[in-house]
């Protein structure tokens, strides 16, 4: 029984890896042909859903079903947000490209067709697809322990994950409305007048941290990791790698974004000094000295 289940897990991992490799190669080829390097961005919110339901079909259990359902809610919401910003197009390989890839193409270390092509192959197309697979990997822990009953850890992980999905949705909606008002250039009936004067978002959840949507996204996948903890009984297991690498990616991404904003908006450096990046530590009450 144990050997049979191990073989099934190995087969599932093989399916994931083959699928991930095929998608990465496709993203590389399409992005090189079209010069639109946001092909992985289009699939970022969709691939975890695919991994989830493949796992659920092969290893049906209450835990895997709950995890797959939460990932589907997360993915559909994020896909909707990406779509309304112009990320998807009726022609699949078209759509809005993330402005940061254009900035990266102008970087002296990456400038040139060959250099950026290598960066596209190793980082944009392959590393990011590997990362998606890794932060989805708590599903493998749940699949390998499908007979383990649900615990209080599952309940807490599910409640907090759903909470952070809602927070991320609020943050994304606030930012989307801000950019709508900014693009319309209206002078009346504007919700984010203070932010519009500065040119960047400083209201709503942005009063507390500079990247509330990034904070929520990282916490979503940390919560997801705890389903694997509940299934395996191991507080530290291999699936933690995905959450850690995702956090590192967001740290690097936010630094790139903030560098661009600092050059573009004179007041951004002040905002950067006054408001925390991810954790609203500044708004916690200070400890009292005895």
Task: Give residue spans per PLM region.
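Juxtamembrane helix-capping/reentrant segments at transmembrane boundaries
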Residues: 35, 39-50, 86-121, 199-206, ...
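Juxtamembrane membrane-interface segments at transmembrane-helix boundaries in membrane proteins
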Residues: 1-10, 111-112
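PAPS-dependent sulfotransferase catalytic domain
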Residues: 97-147, 158
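Generic enzyme active-site microenvironment
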Residues: 39, 126, 209
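Hydrophobic transmembrane alpha-helices
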Residues: 6-24, 47-82, 88, 129-174, ...
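Transmembrane-helix signature of polytopic, lipid-linked glycan biosynthesis machinery
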Residues: 25-32
């Amino acid at each position: 029984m144990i050997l049979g289940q191990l073989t099934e897990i190995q087969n599932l991992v093989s399916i994931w890896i083959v699928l991930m490799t095929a998608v990465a190669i496709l993203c590389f080829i399409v992005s090189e042909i079209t010069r639109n390097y946001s092909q992985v961005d289009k699939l970022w919110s969709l691939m975890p859903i695919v991994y989830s339901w493949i796992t659920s079909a092969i290893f049906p259990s209450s835990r895997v079903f709950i995890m797959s359902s939460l990932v589907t809610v997360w993915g559909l919401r994020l896909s909707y947000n990406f779509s309304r910003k112009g990320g998807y197009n009726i022609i699949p390989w078209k759509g809005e490209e993330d402005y940061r890839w254009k900035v990266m193409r102008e970087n002296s270390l990456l400038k040139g067709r060959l250099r950026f092509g290598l960066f596209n192959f190793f980082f944009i197309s392959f590393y990011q697809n590997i990362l998606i697979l890794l932060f989805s990997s708590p599903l493998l822990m749940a699949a390998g322990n499908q007979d383990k009953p649900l615990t209080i850890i599952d309940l807490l992980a599910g409640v907090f994950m759903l909470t952070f999905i809602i927070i991320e949705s609020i943050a994304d909606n606030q930012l989307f409305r801000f950019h709508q008002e900014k693009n319309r250039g209206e002078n009346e009936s504007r919700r984010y007048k203070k932010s519009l004067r500065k040119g960047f978002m400083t209201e709503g959840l942005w009063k507390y941290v500079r990247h509330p949507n990034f904070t929520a996204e990282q916490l979503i996948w940390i919560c997801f990791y705890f389903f694997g903890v509940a299934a395996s009984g191991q507080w530290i297991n291999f699936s933690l790698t995905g959450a850690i690498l995702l956090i590192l990616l967001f740290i690097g991404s936010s630094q790139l974004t903030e560098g661009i904003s600092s050059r573009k908006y004179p007041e951004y450096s002040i905002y950067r000094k006054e408001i925390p990046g991810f954790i609203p530590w500044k708004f916690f009450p200070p400890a009292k000295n005895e």
